């Protein structure tokens, strides 16, 4: 569930109630990688979310948007996620 708190947006994963989609947008003639996150009804983790792949959306309609201006930034986030996963063992 995505919770909008006073000073942060908190994303709590584990029940399949956060949907997300990835893609790219154009900004000032540059491609920017994006991931949008949204609340949805719980479902099996990994099942298709409410927004089907290829659907055009306005990223301003979502409570959390990650924007990547460099591919290296995506690598850093992946590394952090893998470390968090490892620490859960």
Residue ranges and their predicted role:
Residues 1-89:
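Positively charged, low-complexity terminal tracts
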């Amino acid at each position: 569930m995505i919770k909008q708190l006073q000073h942060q947006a908190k994303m709590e994963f584990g029940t399949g109630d956060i949907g997300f989609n990835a893609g790219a947008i154009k900004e000032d003639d540059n491609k920017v990688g994006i991931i949008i996150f949204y609340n949805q009804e719980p479902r099996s983790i990994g099942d298709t979310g409410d927004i089907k792949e290829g659907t055009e959306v306005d990223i301003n309609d979502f409570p959390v948007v990650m924007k990547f201006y460099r591919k290296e930034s995506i690598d850093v986030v992946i590394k952090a996620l893998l470390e968090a996963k490892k620490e859960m063992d």
